[in-house]
Design a protein with these regions (language model features):
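Juxtamembrane helix-start elements in MFS-like secondary transporters
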Residues: 2-10, 60, 90-94
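Short hydrophobic/small-residue motifs within alpha-helical transmembrane segments
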Residues: 11-15, 102-103
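Helix-to-loop junctions at the C-terminal end of transmembrane segments
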Residues: 19-33, 116-117
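Membrane-helix boundary and inter-helical linker elements of multi-pass secondary transporters
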Residues: 29-30, 52-53, 84, 116-122
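C-terminal transmembrane helical hairpin of 12-TM major facilitator-type secondary transporters
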Residues: 34-78
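Intracellular helix-loop hinge segments at the cytoplasmic ends of transmembrane helices
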Residues: 72, 76-85, 98
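Multi-pass alpha-helical transporter architecture, strongest
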Residues: 129-146
Length: 146
């Protein structure tokens, strides 16, 4: 597979994000914050699970778009909550959120790299979906009790 093809497939994640931005108002009204987190987590689990099981790259293309859409369902809920953590220090709260996001991405790349060497791609991709649904359900439970 060429790097151009890989880049085009990965661009689908951004396309999913754009789709989310076009539908966010309707989604928030219908699902609420807890629903966004829960549905986003379920879609992430299904998407990563399907990618882990996929045997042909063409199947992965719509799944990557779906991952972009569902990632932003979860991420946007977390980000919105970050702005409400400390209203008197909103800038600091959002900065802390961004710091944690980028630190998590850096640590995730290192951790996943080692995990792939030990376990292979498919189990690690599947476990990513499991970790994300756990995060989504934890957040959803916190939103329900807030």
């Amino acid at each position: 597979m060429t790097y151009t093809t890989i880049g085009l497939i990965l661009a689908g994640f951004g396309l999913g994000g754009v789709g989310y931005s076009l539908l966010v108002r309707t989604l928030v009204l219908r699902l609420g914050e807890g629903g966004l987190a829960g549905v986003g987590g379920v879609l992430l689990l299904l998407g990563f699970g399907a990618i882990a099981a996929a045997t042909d790259w063409i199947v992965i293309v719509p799944l990557v778009v779906s991952l972009g859409f569902s990632f932003y369902m979860l991420h946007n809920t977390l980000q919105t909550r970050a702005t409400e953590m400390a209203p008197e220090a909103r800038g600091s709260a959002v900065s802390l959120f961004a710091f944690c996001l980028f630190l998590g991405q850096a640590a995730g790349v290192s951790t996943v790299g080692v995990a792939i060497e030990w376990l292979g791609y498919r189990p690690v991709i599947g476990l990513t979906g499991v970790a994300l649904i756990a995060l989504a359900f934890w957040l959803r439970a916190r939103l329900v009790h807030a």
